[in-house]
Amino acid sequence: HASTRRLVLQGADAVAFIADSQVSETENNAASFLDLRANLKELGRSMRDVPLVIQFNKRDLANTRSDAEIDELARRGKEPVFKASAVHGQGVIESFFGLLDRAWRKLDAEHDLRQKLAIGPDDFLAKAAASLGYEGRARELCEAHVGGRRGQ
């Protein structure tokens, strides 16, 4: 798995770190996050250089971290944190749009996408939201997180 993760990270424009909300998975989440950092470092990349969102999934299960605990973790970090239950479809599209927002803004800063493609980040996100059936909700989707800053 480690070699596959490194290969995927090598060409990644952004990363969604999916953490398990169950308290019993706290150590595994921490180990996976440290592994992500180490893999990026091996590739000559830094956590600061790669747009990142964190999603706490499995919010529907028992014995999960409380919203207050996740909110506190989010306040301590720079990355936006999304709460989700993938099996119920909650928080998934929001996590995606949070990541899409950060990725677009980073790529725009590096490659001047706004000029080359004649579309700014807000219009790009609005079109993406509309194409997925979320007309007029791009900003709401991007901002459905705790912690972090939009587009950073």
Language model: regions and residue ranges:
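Canonical P-loop GTPase G-domain recognition
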Residues: 50-53, 60-113
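C-terminal-of-GTPase-core extension/linker across diverse P-loop GTPases
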Residues: 88-90, 101-152
